[in-house]
A protein has these predicted regions:
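Acidic catalytic/metal-coordinating carboxylates
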Residues: 37-40, 63-67
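Active-site beta3 strand of CheY-like receiver
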Residues: 48-54
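C-terminal output helix
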Residues: 109-118
Length: 136
């Protein structure tokens, strides 16, 4: 699958992390949408129906968990989600998995780790892997 055909919604209140993710993912060819809090993230997700949601667990106005609970109950079904968090708790991770989170990445993290998780969730093959269509 070609990244240019995919939209990713970043929902995080940390400006530096959002801008780092945006720069790297736009350079990979993804279309990036940004929301700075849970309420905005929920509105953008419902309006745009992105291919992937990268969601911070702890944010103002509505936590990542509340966003997931709302999205899970919507008619369109769950958007594939990678949760990022500074929280270490195993109960949080277990609840995220119960809500259908595809990957759970602890802050701080290497951007390469996030990119690998995104590629895995979206089925994007890295360059050089068999079957990758490398147009010059």
């Amino acid at each position: 699958m070609n990244p240019q055909q995919r939209t990713i919604l970043l929902v995080d209140d940390d400006h530096e992390i959002v801008e780092s993710m945006r720069t790297i993912l736009e350079n990979k060819g993804y279309r990036i949408l940004v929301a700075r809090d849970g309420n905005s993230g929920l509105m953008v997700a419902e309006r745009e129906n992105p291919d992937l949601l990268i969601l911070d667990m702890m944010m103002p106005k509505k936590s990542g968990f509340l966003v997931l609970e709302k999205l899970r109950s919507r008619p369109g079904g769950m958007i594939p989600t990678i949760m990022i968090t500074g929280n270490e708790g195993s109960r949080h991770r277990a609840y995220a998995e119960m809500l259908g989170v595809r990957d759970y990445i602890r802050k701080p993290f290497a951007m390469e780790k996030l990119v690998r998780a995104i590629d895995k969730v979206l089925g994007v093959k890295p360059r050089g892997e068999a079957g990758f269509d490398d147009e010059g």
